[in-house]
Amino acid sequence: MKKTKFLFIASLIYSASNVYAVDSAIDSTKVVNLDEVSVVASRATDKTPVAFTNVSAKELEKVNYGQDVPYLLQYTPSVITTSDAGAGVGYTSIRVRGTDATRINVTANGIPMNDAESHGLFWVNMPDFASSLKDIQIQRGAGTSTNGAGAFGASINMLTQSAGFSPSAEFNASYGSFNTHKETVKVSSGLLNNHWTVDARISNIGTDGYIDRASVNLNSYFLQAGYFNNNTTLKFITFGGKEKTYHAWNYASKEEMFNYGRTYNSCGEYIDDNGNVAYYDDQTDNYAQFNFQLILNQRLSSSLSLNAALHYTKGDGYYEEYKTKRTLAEYGFDPVEIGTKKSDLVRKKEMDNHFGGGMLSLNYKKGRVNAQAGMAANHYYGDHFGNTPWVKAVGLLPEYHEYYRNTGKKTDVNMYARSTVDIVSGLNAFVDLQYRHINYTIAGVNDNFDYNIDDMQKLDINDNFNFFNPKAGLNWQFCNYNRAYFSFSVAQKEPTRNNYTDGKVAQYPKAEKLYDYEFGYTFNNNCFSIGANLYYMWYRDQLVLTGELNEIGEAMAANVAKSYRMGVELFADWHPAKWFTWSTNATISKNRIKDFVETVYEDEWTNPVEINHGDTHIAFSPSFIFNNSFNFNYNNFDLSLSTQYVSKQYMTNAEYEDQVLDAYCVSNLHLGYNFKLPHTKSVRIGFSIYNLFDEEYENNGYAGGGYYVDGGEKVFYRYSGYAAQAGTNFMGSVSFKF
């Protein structure tokens, strides 16, 4: 039914676009800058002294069978990915150089996409966004100045698809293991009246998930309308998605995996009135997010151009969760009135978010100088609130029982100036200066119960930050095929909402500061390229993952005074023939905390005990990552065999050997064949085998510990959970372009 609806809508739009296109002969000479730039010129080029990788739409298309964007980038240098459901669809995330997603800046057309409070990007709210992208650039390290939260390990710069000259339509469908499927319809009007274009996409993605009950149901859209003339490009872009995802964030201990299997999922589990294990059907996350962008690119002269944008994002949703034997006082109930202190219950947590702003940049390019200056201002307003629709000891509550509500507000203003100057032939200097001001407030009552005051946690946070982030470097291109560069960057970043609300100490978390040194060399000719990038990232007050999760499955972090990440990224590509390419890259790194002191709590909350471990590995930061890909293209057939090896990762910063993610090596095989049928531009069929050699592995987890007192002696304990990933699984696809 859904596929029929998609095809019907596509045929209507495609037919209409043909009618209008006939009336306006396409004259490409009257349309300038159709491949418009984003509102902020934050892209790195071969003259920018930073480490970066570009991934084209063609590369994305070959592997885009429904997995989220992080999984489409997993073979780029220093990248590892995670998946709650175990197969790359649903709640997924990405780490670069060991840095988690809350410290990776993500933009679309230069507009910030990270959540203003959590700093993460929930890809589940942007399903199939890869189908509407022109390309993606990943900058590793501090990178160039950009909008939104600071880049502390990397930035991901996405550029949405260009408008086309000719009417077109496309239909893609995929199906595979775990009932995973994706249906996508894309249409383009072509050029209307020599000035206008309209492009649209709708997608549906679903899966039962590898992990038990980890089902995902996703819908999304993309729509852009553009106006073009000789000196002006004006685009309105909107995209959004709705998701319904069953919780799978509890993961499983090794003991649970042994007893119940690797797919065991405790989320929603309870004991019914007959003493049987049951699962709550509505243990789902339900969220809708809609993004709107209005982007203007204006050429003022042959050397000067102006970019401006307005943007707005609306998000709202909720999730329900069955909780067993909960203390009723934690939910605002009077135990005396109810007649019991504890009861099973269902809690419903809701969010209503608004994020918007504007940005402006001026670009100058003439002779030896390429310079940009710009500014941006963004504001966020978000309500967090929750209620308990059902309590076992009472039944359905006759009235709405809200037990917490708080509001977060954030204003973020930044200004920057950047210039690349050619000093002599082949040698250029790069300077990038940014000032950023942030005001962040949270007011109200949180969902954490504070036993020190015997009441819900009160929030009255008002924090201000002023950051100056300078960057400078040299880039030297010599002897035709050689390039060398060096850069030094300073980056600073404010804490996230969870750093304030989940901390076990009274004082505010500290802002982080990064000093990033990068030195690289590349050789690139027609058939062979090789390169190396050395980096040293020294942090002051880095907020490192502790290994623990808060009550809603989000990773917790804490400041450490001194830490660093250093390493070398190696990469090579060999093209000995038109039909064969061998690509490989590796990251060898050392990620350490200086003089780490672990704080262990009685019952994980009171009476802290400190243990000094000296210098330790930073959690979730592998020392070695290796990627290899063999790519064959012959006539209309293509094949790629890609392999990733990730070394052992500690899940806490204390280096306990019983709290690690073991090393793993996973290979994926992709096959594709292109041909034509009558009335089509092209047809492509594809088939993928993921985890070809059936590796049993986990790519994420949590860990923690505490102590209790027995007979006057402290007894320490530790625990851990693991995100099991799917064994060998399959996906097939077909694509029609008209």
Q: For the regions a protein language model found, what residue spans apply to each?
A:
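Gram-negative outer-membrane beta-barrel transporters
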Residues: 425, 536-538, 558-653, 737
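Extracytoplasmic beta-strand/coil segments of soluble accessory domains associated
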Residues: 70-112, 128, 134
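Transmembrane beta-barrel wall of Gram-negative outer-membrane proteins
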Residues: 168, 175-206, 211-248, 292-303, ...
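C-terminal beta-signal and adjacent terminal beta-strands/loops
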Residues: 582, 592, 647-651, 673-738
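Membrane-embedded beta-barrel scaffold of Gram-negative outer-membrane proteins
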Residues: 299, 305-311, 475-477, 483-489, ...
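Short acidic/polar hinge/loop motifs at secondary-structure boundaries
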Residues: 112-140, 159-160, 256
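Short, acidic, small-residue-rich periplasmic hinge/interaction motif at the N-terminus
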Residues: 22-62, 101, 533
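Face-selective signature of the C-terminal outer-membrane beta-barrel domain
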Residues: 287-449, 475-477, 481, 487, ...
